[in-house]
């Protein structure tokens, strides 16, 4: 079961051919599933989630930064959300899912509106990733089977892990599509420097 869960998380947080656990090794860096060469990883689900978060944060925030302020009202069709709405959704879902995973209250934030400035919406998205980093820092796998409220139903806390990682993939893909439809190359499609 844990192997399937870890594989699902890795698949949902990997964009293209770039691995989610990339980066130079550091003695101060947290131990990751990829850095283990012998024996089982302690808390593999949360270890993989925490290792994936910085790259997801980097790519999603870079996509938001890449969209010009005057295009935050853009939506591909009348039935789709605006780019600003997507950014609001990213901030709100990060806060909600990380609070659920960590079993702590969501941060209190001012209501965000689609008419808010790019700077305000970008700051809210950035703050939501910072909140996730802090909220998830000490969570271990032992509580992931506990039931938590998901709307009108109870689900294991690990459902929030799936929702969060799946959301990151979906949100980046949507932002990349909005960028491309405006003639802007998404961050992960940029040539390496």
Indicate residue ranges for each PLM-predicted region.
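Positively charged n-region of N-terminal signal peptides that target proteins for export
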Residues: 1-4
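Bacterial N-terminal signal peptides
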Residues: 6-18
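Solvent-exposed, well-ordered amphipathic alpha-helical segments
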Residues: 13-16, 57, 128-132
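Short, helix-capping/interhelical loops that line the mouth of catalytic, cofactor-
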Residues: 23-48, 92-153, 182-193
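Short, contiguous alpha-helical
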Residues: 50-54, 58-64, 71-110, 149-193
